[in-house]
Amino acid sequence: MRDSAFLKTARGEQAPYTPVWFMRQAGRYMPEYRALRAGKTMLECIRTPDLAAEITLQPIKAMPLDAAILFNDILTPLPTMGLSLDFVGGVGPVIHNPINTPKDVDVLGVPATAETMPYTAESIRLLMPELNSRGIPLIGFVGAPFTLASYAIEGKGSRNYEKTKRFMYAEPAAWARLMGKFESVLADYLTEQVKAGASAVQIFDSWVGALSVYDYQTFVKPATAGLIERVKKLGVPVIYFGTGATHLMPDMASLGSDVMGADWRTPLDKAWDLIQPGQSIQGNLDPLLLQAPWRELKHQTDRILHEANGRPGHIFNVGHGLLPETPQDMVHRLTDYVHEQTQR
């Protein structure tokens, strides 16, 4: 497993070919996923280990992907801290008791995730025999402190994160306490995932691109640095990914992750120049291209591979999650194509 193409590349070593996996590779674009999810809520599937394990394995059984990513959601820890989470059709995740005041921060719990989310480790234990037999590593993941804080304050997804920024500016001490609580819970949660069998982890900072460089450095970087520092001690590669965050990449990369994720807005070679020497990079196809004609998908895949230029350390991925309308046969065809074109 340690010599898998994905793990070698995550460590910056040369692999026999460019490894491929996709964010949201276990998802609604797969008919078998829709069949298994029918009549079940998102949280029900996450909290039922045999369902979560099977969903994680579906794309691995269907396509020659180089890594599995645990079926989970970045918001899973929020209910264990005292926030009421629901997934509402047509809306997405909703927090029914969002954070409005410093007192709301102070009453948030910092639970031991082994006790409050035992289903996650059990899901991993159930799926590891299959992954081990295939030599496929598992990626565990969490949301980053800022992204979870933004959900907790906004109550749902937001375009501009006005409530989050107002709280951050008006209540800096409470904001620091909130970020510290998320740092502790998320570090503990990733520790449990690695102990159960994950051999790499990804930290999703989905909404960090809404921040200026100054605000990232002042209000977000300390807790995120603490999280990455704690997770690095687990001895597995750490991937750090933000959306719309090219302007933040030098600061994000300075936190010491092994791999930096890049979205599709910046050419891969330009993004690679923004990060630390020796860091690997992951990305960065626009996920909508998987719904384009093959000639265009092939053309832009060739462009990305040209930008990578055969350098060790490139993990091929989309620059955001796969969309529900994505044709599964295109995902399979693309995976095969990247493998064929990058044989070394």
UniProtKB/Swiss-Prot annotation:
EC class of the enzyme, as a word: lyase
Binding site for substrate: R24, Q25, A26, G27, R28, D73, Y151, S206, H320
Keyword Lyase: yes
GO cellular component assignments: cytosol
Site entry: Transition state stabilizer: D73
Enzyme Commission identifier(s): 4.1.1.37
Organism domain of life: Bacteria
GO biological process, one term: heme biosynthetic process
SS bond partners: none
Principal location: cytoplasm
Subcellular localization: Cytoplasm
CDD domains: URO-D
GO MF, one annotated term: uroporphyrinogen decarboxylase activity
Biological pathway: Porphyrin-containing compound metabolism; protoporphyrin-IX biosynthesis; coproporphyrinogen-III from 5-aminolevulinate: step 4/4
Pfam families: URO-D
Keywords, sorted A to Z: Cytoplasm, Decarboxylase, Lyase, Porphyrin biosynthesis
Catalytic activity: uroporphyrinogen III + 4 H(+) = coproporphyrinogen III + 4 CO2
Protein function: Catalyzes the decarboxylation of four acetate groups of uroporphyrinogen-III to yield coproporphyrinogen-III.
Subunit structure: Homodimer.
Family according to the record: Belongs to the uroporphyrinogen decarboxylase family.
Protein name: Uroporphyrinogen decarboxylase
Species of provenance: Deinococcus radiodurans (strain ATCC 13939 / DSM 20539 / JCM 16871 / CCUG 27074 / LMG 4051 / NBRC 15346 / NCIMB 9279 / VKM B-1422 / R1)
